């Protein structure tokens, strides 16, 4: 909602189609009367009613809703079948926020006159405002089938398609309203609100040059109007044009200093440019001006994390949570910071809280499962991932993780089924193929295992698990000459894994390369001893099954974040 005198135009904003189009509808009703014939006295009555309805529309424009309603009801009482009267009464209800009553009157008007452009356009606005975009689109499309030049319906339809992500169609509609010519420039008299909407659509459609030209024009037309400059800055920031957005926010700040929303958005844009010092100053100012707002604190936490200041980051996010308890992004980032700093158990409740507050984020489930995987709690990890798979059945990643956890439990059939579901959604995934190859090898299907593992390596020449498992398989099959180059490539990828050195020791021994074998055995013993001292009792060497030693893992648990994860938070608008 607009605050502090600023006007915001966003993808869900709708032009008001109300009184003016009702007036147009009166003329239309004369052409499409609900009565097939009228005698002279009936015609006179209708003329009087039209005059009365125009008077009501004028009163409504003047803000005198009660007087307008009284006239509209009198007209309806005298002529219950008069569609325009029902339409006007619907507008009155609409302006009062009585959506159900307004919709009833619009639909009654359309029942009486299915070609009432005004009623259909007004119904479309109401449907969009009450979060029924598909019905609203249908309504506006119907308006344009009756009146192809209806500018408000064209504009609103363009915004609805933009909100749906169909930017090319949105651009075509908005260009039609703006009268865009071959040089992609709207008519000189085009409303700035429309130009801003069109610029946003261009940015989302990847039409950067058109967006830049239009932004130049908007900025020039805006002069020193902070509302327009700020709104244009928001549009550009949303389109990742942060450099130019920063300049517009700085101009806005100079024209309207000490506005927290301006400083907040300036800080966010600077953060996205990695200008962390400047971003922190802007956000600190925003936080000081709006101490009850958690968003600047949240962003300051991201900056502290990026600066490798975990304690400061956690303090900012905890303060943000003290201001807004239901803040899934803050809970998630606290968990990320703790997890990144090897405090997985402390992170777990924050991940769980983030999921409970916003179960629509797949990444939250992935990270919570990773906490369990790190502790080899495969059953708990699988439970988390299966919950996510139920919510995100089309995610290849989550089915892969279900399989990963099932493999850790030693449930190879369940793991195979999950991996195959993942592969069906995302063919040629080398990690999934490597896992399927491992499972085939464990079940004695050696030809299938070799084929799958070689395919994984062909797709990803640096896939360590595929190299390890293929080398181990070839050693098992006594194909030592073939195994050696595979295992040597694997050890070049990870020199710290004991299992790979044990396999090399075995291959060198069978090939009578005593010096190489002794070297690899010594390395194996040293690494294994270090592993045991480190508290990891996982088996090594050729032991398969559910132990999942480092050399035998399909791939490491989900990568730990090295920097704050990207969390989409809507820009704050004054």
Name each model feature, range by range.
Residues 47-81, 88-91, 95, 200, ...:
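Alpha-helical segment of the N-proximal tetratricopeptide repeat
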Residues 78, 112, 146, 180, ...:
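Structural marker of alpha-solenoid helical repeat scaffolds
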Residues 5, 10-45, 152-156, 163, ...:
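Long, contiguous interaction/recruitment modules in multidomain scaffold/adaptor proteins
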Residues 61-74, 95-108, 118, 129-142, ...:
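Structural signature of tandem alpha-helical TPR/SEL1-like repeats
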Residues 91, 107, 125, 431-434, ...:
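Alpha-helical adaptor scaffolds
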Residues 49, 83-84, 117-118, 151-152, ...:
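Helix-start (N-cap) detector for alpha-helical repeat units in TPR-like alpha-solenoids
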Residues 28-41, 183, 188-192, 213, ...:
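Terminal, low-structured helical/coil segments at or just beyond the last alpha-helical repeat
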């Amino acid at each position: 909602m607009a605050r502090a005198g600023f006007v915001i135009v966003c993808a869900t904003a709708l032009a008001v189609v109300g009184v003016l189009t009702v007036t147009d509808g009166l003329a239309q009703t004369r052409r499409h009367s609900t009565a097939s014939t009228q005698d002279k006295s009936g015609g006179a009555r209708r003329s009087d009613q039209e005059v009365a309805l125009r008077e009501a529309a004028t009163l409504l424009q003047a803000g005198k809703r009660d007087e307008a309603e009284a006239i509209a009801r009198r007209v309806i009482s005298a002529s219950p079948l008069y569609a325009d009267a029902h339409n006007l009464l619907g507008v009155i209800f609409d302006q009062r926020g009585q959506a159900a009553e307004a919709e009833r009157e619009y639909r009654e008007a359309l029942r009486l006159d299915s070609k009432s452009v005004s009623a259909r356009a007004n119904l479309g606005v109401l449907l969009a405002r009450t979060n029924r975009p598909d019905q609203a689109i249908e309504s506006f499309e119907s308006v344009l089938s009756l009146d192809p030049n209806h500018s408000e319906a064209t504009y609103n339809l363009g915004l609805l398609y933009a909100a749906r992500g169909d930017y090319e169609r949105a651009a075509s509609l908005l260009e039609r309203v703006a009268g865009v010519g071959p040089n992609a420039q709207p008519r000189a008299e085009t409303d700035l609100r429309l130009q801003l909407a069109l610029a946003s659509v261009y940015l989302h459609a990847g039409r950067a040059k058109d967006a830049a030209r239009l932004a130049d024009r908007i900025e020039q037309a805006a002069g020193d109007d902070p509302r327009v400059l700020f709104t244009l800055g928001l549009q550009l920031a949303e389109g990742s044009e942060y450099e130019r957005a920063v300049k517009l926010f700085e101009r806005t700040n100079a024209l309207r200093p000490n506005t927290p929303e301006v400083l907040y958005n300036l800080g966010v844009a600077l953060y996205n440019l990695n200008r962390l010092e400047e971003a922190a100053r802007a956000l600190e100012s925003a936080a000081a001006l709006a101490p009850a707002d958690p968003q600047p604190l949240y962003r300051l936490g991201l900056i502290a994390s990026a600066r490798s200041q975990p304690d400061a980051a956690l303090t900012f996010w905890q303060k943000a949570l003290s201001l807004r308890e239901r803040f899934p992004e803050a809970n998630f980032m606290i968990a990320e910071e703790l997890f990144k700093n090897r405090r997985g158990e402390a992170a777990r409740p924050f991940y769980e809280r983030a999921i409970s507050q916003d179960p629509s984020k797949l990444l939250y489930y992935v990270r919570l499962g990773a906490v369990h995987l790190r502790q080899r709690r495969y059953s708990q990890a699988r439970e988390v991932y299966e919950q996510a798979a139920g919510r995100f059945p089309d995610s290849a990643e989550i089915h892969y993780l279900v399989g990963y956890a099932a493999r850790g439990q030693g449930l190879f059939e369940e793991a195979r089924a999950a991996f195959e579901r993942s592969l069906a959604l995302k063919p040629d995934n080398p990690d999934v193929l490597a896992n399927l190859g491992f499972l085939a090898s464990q079940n004695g299907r050696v030809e299938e295992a070799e084929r799958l593992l070689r395919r994984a390596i062909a797709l990803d020449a640096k896939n360590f698990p595929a190299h390890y498992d293929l080398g181990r398989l070839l050693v098992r099959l006594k194909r030592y000459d073939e195994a050696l180059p595979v295992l040597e490539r694997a050890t070049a990828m990870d020199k710290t894994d004991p299992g790979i050195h044990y396999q090399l020791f075995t291959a060198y021994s069978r090939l009578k390369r005593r010096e190489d074998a002794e070297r690899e055995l010594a390395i194996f013993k040293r690494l294994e001893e270090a592993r045991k001292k480190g508290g990891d009792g996982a088996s090594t060497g050729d032991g398969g099954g559910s132990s999942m030693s480092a050399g035998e893992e399909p791939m490491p648990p989900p990568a730990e974040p090295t920097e704050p994860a990207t969390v989409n938070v809507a820009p704050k608008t004054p």
